[in-house]
């Protein structure tokens, strides 16, 4: 019994250490970014911008009803600081793709120069046996129809390989979470390539209290700019048309 208690204590300590290991910047990539939510709370965006940060993904919505409490403020502040911004939706298996797409569209108005919308999908459907791919695909299609741009799929590598290697997903940009492997970038089969890599979840920047996720873009600045949203005509009034 004492052995089991000691073993459990060591496991707890190791997990805590692994989750708080400081993420070092990967400066060999030309385009650098972070992703945030209400957990980051107060941010000095001018200080962040002075540290060679180019883009910021911010959580906008989750499921069919939840909006991140700081999304409106962050969305405006990122723009004012001269950084490229992107909004992501955390997908829930407990409401329909249609409801979730409508919620995102009502919340996020893209402007020229923003990153495409992101679908964060990393949990199974509610019966734990069905793949989320069909619901995710429906969300992606509805969002693409509304904004006229290919959304980005965010997930971790194992989940992507299990659910999103089908032909129907091949044209969507990929944002992969893969930590603690600075010399081992994400692997995407069938000749596909990741667009963004979230390589750590405990980075530190002046202007942000505590940890923040670090990300990089796979290529050069010219390729990055080609990915950015170009239309300026989208607004939430088109929700019913898209759905």
PLM regions with names:
Residues 116-190:
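Catalytic domains of cell-wall/extracellular-matrix polysaccharide-remodeling enzymes
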Residues 34-44, 60-71, 90-99, 125-130, ...:
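Acidic-and-aromatic substrate-binding clefts and catalytic sites of carbohydrate-active enzymes
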Residues 9-16:
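Bacterial N-terminal signal peptides
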């Amino acid at each position: 019994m004492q052995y089991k208690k000691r073993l459990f204590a060591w496991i707890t300590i190791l997990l805590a250490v692994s989750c708080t290991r400081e993420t070092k910047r990967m400066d060999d990539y030309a385009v650098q970014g972070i992703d945030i939510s209400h957990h980051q709370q107060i941010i000095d965006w001018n200080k962040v911008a002075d540290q060679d940060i180019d883009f910021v993904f911010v959580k906008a919505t989750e499921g069919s009803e939840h909006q991140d409490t700081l999304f409106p403020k962050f969305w405006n502040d990122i723009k004012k600081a001269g950084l490229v911004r992107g909004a992501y939706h955390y997908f829930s298996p407990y409401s329909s793709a249609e409801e979730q797409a409508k919620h995102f569209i009502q919340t996020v108005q893209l402007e020229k120069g923003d990153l495409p919308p992101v679908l964060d999908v990393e949990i199974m459907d509610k019966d734990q046996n069905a793949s989320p791919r069909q619901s995710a695909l429906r969300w992606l299609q509805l969002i693409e129809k509304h904004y006229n741009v290919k959304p980005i799929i965010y997930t971790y590598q194992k989940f992507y390989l299990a659910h999103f290697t089908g032909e129907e997903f091949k044209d969507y940009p990929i944002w992969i979470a893969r930590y603690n492997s600075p010399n081992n970038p994400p692997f995407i089969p069938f000749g596909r390539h990741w667009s963004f890599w979230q390589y750590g979840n405990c980075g530190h920047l002046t202007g942000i209290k505590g940890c923040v996720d670090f990300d990089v873009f796979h290529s050069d600045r010219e390729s990055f700019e080609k990915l950015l949203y170009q239309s300026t005509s989208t607004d939430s009034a088109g929700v019913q048309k898209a759905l």
